[in-house]
Amino acid sequence: MEKLMEEKKTTLWQEIKICRVDETNYPHDLKKIKDRPEVLYYRGNIDILNEHKSIAVVGSRKISAVGAKLAYNAGSIIGKNGFNLVNGLALGCDAEALKGALAAGGKCAVVLPCGINEIYPKSNQWIAEEVLKQGGCLISEYPEGTRPEKYRFVQRDRLQSGMSQGVLVVEAMEKSGTMHTAEYAKKQNRRLACY
């Protein structure tokens, strides 16, 4: 039984797929932004981004207890209502929102600041595995083997907003990475809300 479980886990991580901007499964909303990537690398079901509306939920890594509850509840509401939850798998708000969406049976799209073969942060790998098990996807604009660098987090933020119809900020400092996502939402004419 243990061997079967390990094989099943390994299978989730085996195949990295590529989606070009001219392909039908490239996220339609992402096609509309000026600085879209020409190629996306992904695992899982990227089609969810064209089948259902998506909402990005982002916020502080160092989240308060109230913020954690709000992020979880926001994720749960998004999941229960048939929307995709999009974020970057970061500690704090991102992780709590993903947990809420997954617990509600929702689908999630995680945008990574590195190659798809590396989950960042490693402590959230179990969440990434749950995203795949529940029919979601992991996405990156970077090829396998690309390490997470500071500037790649900002680049990831534009994709989180770009593939969503709206961005919900739960908690954030004025000069935080979350504010990059909020700025991209404004530039990309996405709905922006604070919770």
PLM feature spans:
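Long amphipathic alpha-helical segments
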Residues: M1-K8, I18
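Glycine-biased, small-residue-rich flexible motifs in mid-sequence functional cores and linkers
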Residues: L12-Y195
